[in-house]
Amino acid sequence: MATDKITRDVQSEIYEFIRQEVLDKGYPPSVREICAKVGLSSTSTVHGHLSRLEKKGLIRRDPTKPRAIELIKDPISKREMIDIPIVGKVQAGQPILAVENIDDYLTIPLNFVRNTNDLFILKISGNSMIEAGIYDGDLAIIEKTNYAQNGDIVVALIENDATIKRFFKEKDKIRLQPENHTMDPIIVDNCEVIGKLAGIYRRY
């Protein structure tokens, strides 16, 4: 009986943690986050608890999607979600969303983004856009497009390197302006715009 009591307590902790994460963040935790929260080192043990919660009709899982845990009897979990690929590298002449370029996926509520077409995510490295509220380590949600207007924050390819800057077309040059007064703009004859900033996701 003692073992049954411990099992029920752990399952309750897991269920409440999932519920709180959905309430606070809009999406469920990963299995590793559940491990850390309830003090379990084995992901297979957590999967076992999730399977039992599923059999009890408390949750529903989709094995084809990351973080796809739905709390069946809880209305806060009924939001539609979207999986956005996190791209590790961007290279000229190569499809951005090629399988080999995708490092992971981020699952967020659908209402967090205005346009769900051709979205991908790049992790921000550096401080060139801090005055626009974009910080090192942020996840930039990018709408794939080759078109940009002056003042748009874009992802541009320059000599096979991707950079996020504010775009300005000036006569026969293009100015890629950082949002950091200590840094100089990048002036180029041409560049390939591959997307525009659609939003920022920050993990705390």
Curated annotation (Swiss-Prot):
Subunit details: Homodimer.
EC numbers, comma separated: 3.4.21.88
Enzymatic reactions: Hydrolysis of Ala-|-Gly bond in repressor LexA
HAMAP family: LexA
Source domain of life: Bacteria
One GO MF term: serine-type endopeptidase activity
Record site feature (Cleavage), residues: 92-93
The family this protein is said to belong to: Belongs to the peptidase S24 family.
Protein's recorded name: LexA repressor
UniProt-annotated catalytic positions: 128 (for autocatalytic cleavage activity), 165 (for autocatalytic cleavage activity)
DNA-binding region residue numbers: 31-51
GO BP term, pick one: DNA repair
Keywords for the protein's UniProt record, in alphabetical order: Autocatalytic cleavage, DNA damage, DNA repair, DNA replication, DNA-binding, Hydrolase, Repressor, SOS response, Transcription, Transcription regulation
